[in-house]
């Protein structure tokens, strides 16, 4: 048997995937973020580097110095043997260059997208603060070097970017906003805004509770179960009718204040004497009544609580009693036999009418010799008046007598009769002058002219 060994091909890196799928627009989001440095970690480092300065530590600078000690090469061999590495100061070892091999199945046409690398449109300009510089002191015996940084003129830079919404190169990375060393951020604005989403008018949904059936029946809430016949209640029947109107008289001899018989009765201090009805002994609470129907009768019920025993802490111990009175029975519905209408037993039924009437021929009924000469037609209408007697209601004999003899003193008032005569003799009214009023039909002088009246008062009216 010959075993064939298949060489495992190396998977394409994120950069290779980005070069081949970016033009087609099928790149995954994680590949685009990794190549374009837009991951969450890159964003954190980008914004954190604006306010934090690490100096020459070589963190995130991309210089490849590996810090103070440089890079330490990784072991390639058996595990478990730790190689001895001696760090020499001043000697910096760089990482080896990875050479990727080209397989025979790789495409011979090299994509030109690789040549268009990420374009940096510009680095932010950092302004030097106006205060004094940094003083550096060394530990040697030499004279320390003092860096005198002269303040420069502060210049405020505003960046405006004009974008073409028709085409935007995804490989161009927008620069970070310029930041001053003092921590002030210069915010730039863009003249082109993103496409706004489609504005859809919102409608208010009204929930209609329409009936689900053709003949809806209003539902009724189920009545709560009273539980009057449970094992926890003592059943006591009361025959005394006082239980319906004044049940407190069966519990105590006192004369209580008027209480509503339909409310719950509470007896705070039960008497030590025996109750008028021994069945109501030690009753401290009598709840409101309830009407129920059981086994064809109407039953009046009340639930009472006994206070048989009290503890020192004030806890009451006692049972519960169901007092009931059967008011009346519910009779069964009587079945009434219906009688046929239109027939009377007092009149006989005629079944054969052939012998009651004589049959004549039509020729015998015709008389052609009748003469209507010297005759006239007379229509008479008679009205018969029938008196209807309506019995009157009988009035009982009640002796009508006068009221008590009460006389009030009266004083006669005499008013003399004096004929009324006019105190002023009537005077005649004479009118002198030529005053007059126009007829209303003469007020309108034109179709579109204002209506007004003419009055002439040139003389006087004498009375």
UniProtKB/Swiss-Prot annotation:
Keywords: Capsid protein, Cytoplasmic inwards viral transport, Disulfide bond, DNA-binding, Host endosome, Host Golgi apparatus, Host nucleus, Host-virus interaction, Late protein, Microtubular inwards viral transport, Phosphoprotein, Viral penetration into host nucleus, Virion, Virus entry into host cell. The keyword Disulfide bond applies. It is found in: Virion; Host nucleus; Host early endosome; Host Golgi apparatus. Its main location: virion. It holds the Pfam family Late_protein_L2. The keyword Disulfide bond applies. GO terms for molecular function: DNA binding; structural molecule activity. Highly phosphorylated. InterPro entries: Late_L2. Disulfide bonds join 21-27. GO terms for biological process: microtubule-dependent intracellular transport of viral material towards nucleus; symbiont entry into host cell; viral penetration into host nucleus. A motif (Nuclear localization signal) lies at residues 1-12, 444-452. One of its GO terms (cellular component) is host cell Golgi apparatus. Belongs to the papillomaviridae L2 protein family. Interacts with major capsid protein L1. Interacts with E2; this interaction inhibits E2 transcriptional activity but not the DNA replication function E2. Interacts with host GADD45GIP1. Interacts with host HSPA8; this interaction is required for L2 nuclear translocation. Interacts with host importins KPNB2 and KPNB3. Forms a complex with importin alpha2-beta1 heterodimers via interaction with the importin alpha2 adapter. Interacts with host DYNLT1; this interaction is essential for virus intracellular transport during entry. Minor protein of the capsid that localizes along the inner surface of the virion, within the central cavities beneath the L1 pentamers. Plays a role in capsid stabilization through interaction with the major capsid protein L1. Once the virion enters the host cell, L2 escorts the genomic DNA into the nucleus by promoting escape from the endosomal compartments and traffic through the host Golgi network. This is Minor capsid protein L2. It comes from Human papillomavirus 43. The gene is L2.
